[in-house]
Amino acid sequence: AKMVCLDLDHPEIIDFVNWKVEEEKKVAALIAAGYPSDYEGEAYRTVSGQNSNNSVRVPNNFFKTLDENGDWELKARSDGRTMKTVKAQALWDQINYAAWRCADPGTQYDTTINEWHTCPEGGPIRASNPCSEYMFLDNTACNLASVNLRRFFDEQNNLFDVKGFEYTCRLWTVVLEISVLMAQFPSKEVAQLSYDYRTLGLGYANLGSMLMVSGIAYDSDEARAIAGSITAIMTGVSYTTSAEMAAFLGSFDKYQLNKEHMLRVMRNHRAAAYDAMDAYEGLEIKPQGIDAKYCPDYLLKAATKAWDSAVQLGEKYGYRNAQTTVIAPTGTIGLVMDCDTTGVEPDFALVKFKKLSGGGYFKIINQSVPQALRNLKYSEAELEEIVNYAKGHATLKGAPHINEISLGEKGFLPA
């Protein structure tokens, strides 16, 4: 796989946006003619663009032009001349349609990405890896490691094991730091820059399953606060560990060159943990921090403590690593870790079909549903009836004992 990025003011941006839309039309015609529809079949092997993820790099000034219903200038790469002018709204509509039609292109918000860049003295961030979680300098890399959040969640008491999670984040930060020395890289340049910056890739998976088990709607203020606090704990603890390693081993080679930039980014992370909107530095768009109104107090305290430590130790010792965390889709390793959901994603279905080794399928309920119903205070008898209904109808709509009004108030929408 590869990531292909194009700046939004590139003269060929419209062709790029519509590239896969047109290729998918060819696939549809071939399938209609009788070719197999599987992604490794002849239809998909015949068309272009199937080995890449495409993204457009969108700067903040485009959205200002969009709000004003203005014209967007497409610039020559060689000398910056305006080659063509298009309506910003028309271009944005095409991007949205293409993403809906064939899932490409994605959007990468160039201004925001570079405002959170820890090492701008090394150059701008121009692209990402194929899954778009790792954003750093050209020709750098990081090794990934993800933690299964469900393993830290006490389903009976609806509590997250903060101490265990912090220990795991510390341990894996050290492991990933060691991996910088042990990893094999595809080129000398990638190897050298990876040694110079020592970027790491600690993340997590199974957030959607953990939220479902706890009885909290994925698209809710409570879920966003919990996810934000857990992410803040992970990243804060990881940078704290990086600073502790720097005290003994020294900071990464390019740290002094980027010291003030990196410390500013660290302070902005701390401001987000405290939801201190006035404390952000050098940001055109200020992010939503952790909302204390919706976040469990023990998670919020752990998040702010982690970032206080990360900033204080970083100011004293620097950091061993230019970046420490990313949240990957975990598509393959998530299966090995027994995750019901990947990365930060919600579960895709309440009812699933399990393929049998001897052939055939049987229908199973999402394994998070029974415990979610228990945490929502349904009795075992009610739980059994709801589960059996869902397996038979593939939906909870119309199920016995389900109060759709109260579920709607909690953020669960009809499905």
Predicted regions and their residues:
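Long, C-terminal-biased catalytic regions of enzyme "large/alpha" subunits
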Residues: 1-415
